[in-house]
Amino acid sequence: MSEKLQKVLARAGHGSRREIESIIEAGRVSVDGKIAKLGDRVEITPGLKIRIDGHLISVRESAEQICRVLAYYKPEGELCTRNDPEGRPTVFDRLPKLRGARWIAVGRLDVNTCGLLLFTTDGELANRLMHPSREVEREYAVRVFGQVDDAKLRDLSRGVQLEDGPAAFKTIKFSGGEGINQWYNVTLTEGRNREVRRLWEAVGVQVSRLIRVRYGDIPLPKGLPRGGWTELDLAQTNYLRELVELPPETSSKVAVEKDRRRMKANQIRRAVKRHSQVSGGRRSGGRNNNG
């Protein structure tokens, strides 16, 4: 069965659907030697040859690919880009290496924002989670500097005009602090550039700290250090897929890795047991000889 080329490439982890559409429009993709056009359809067969910038790439049937998702604790100071010409650290630097796929960031966090950033190998999942029409909640813990009164909170809930259109917080909850340094938890259902900061600035309040603590129902994992990552299990991955109307996965790389670790641990235990038995027998034999 044929599928749209951009969907096949996105699913294979070669970028989000929007990124793939851009490189197709730029004439950087070829199918069986012919430059591809946006909207082309392909059928995955053993002889299919797809190239990006002249490099042959790997694509597989949907059922053959395992969708993987990472939760990463982005520190302040890291850029949400694959490569920085100035050599500054990026969010991709610490991620585990992949074969035949690559990590795609689900949205972005600006350089001075820290917290939860999701990555996936499935470009279609990334695209749907980011798209404003899906209205996936993002929750932030924000420390603000300035006087915050009921009128400002009301404006932030009802909506203020930004340079790229109206915006509002879905929820605002006071979470502590004294004087002009206060913490709030806020939620949005879209991911415009620096939107949280710009909303507060629109009512005359400065943001001094910003942490993303949740994406959908996936929280920033407790105990995860800054710069650390953990892979979501099958239930969490399928929650995200079902949230954006993608079919559930039936297997998970996490389960495979856990099984491997369990098998290795069992092998080590058996080896230790055998070693103990052999050593015990030698000691026993030694005592008999001395007797």
UniProtKB/Swiss-Prot annotation:
GO MF assignments: 23S rRNA pseudouridine(2605) synthase activity; RNA binding
Q: Which reaction does it catalyse?
A: uridine(2605) in 23S rRNA = pseudouridine(2605) in 23S rRNA
Q: Does the keyword Isomerase apply?
A: yes
- Renumbered to this chain, region (Disordered) spans 256-291
Q: Tell me where in this chain the S4 RNA-binding domain is found.
A: 3-75
Instruction: Give the EC number(s) under which this enzyme is classified.
Output: 5.4.99.22
What processes in GO biological process is this protein linked to? Answer: enzyme-directed rRNA pseudouridine synthesis
* Record InterPro entries: PsdUridine_synth_cat_dom_sf (IPR020103), PsdUridine_synth_RsuA/RluA (IPR006145), PsdUridine_synth_RsuA/RluB/E/F (IPR000748), PsdUridine_synth_RsuA/RluB_CS (IPR018496), RsuA_PseudoU_synthase (IPR050343), S4_RNA-bd (IPR002942), S4_RNA-bd_sf (IPR036986)
Q: Keyword Lipid biosynthesis: yes or no?
A: no
Note the Pfam families from the entry.
PseudoU_synth_2, S4
| Keywords, ordered alphabetically | Isomerase, RNA-binding, rRNA processing
Catalytic residue list? 110
Q: In which family does this protein belong, per the annotation?
A: Belongs to the pseudouridine synthase RsuA family.
Function of the molecule: Responsible for synthesis of pseudouridine from uracil-2605 in 23S ribosomal RNA.
Under the heading PANTHER family, the entry gives: PSEUDOURIDINE SYNTHASE FAMILY PROTEIN-RELATED, RIBOSOMAL LARGE SUBUNIT PSEUDOURIDINE SYNTHASE B
What this protein is called in its record is Ribosomal large subunit pseudouridine synthase B
Lineage at the top is: Bacteria, Pseudomonadati, Pseudomonadota, Gammaproteobacteria, Enterobacterales
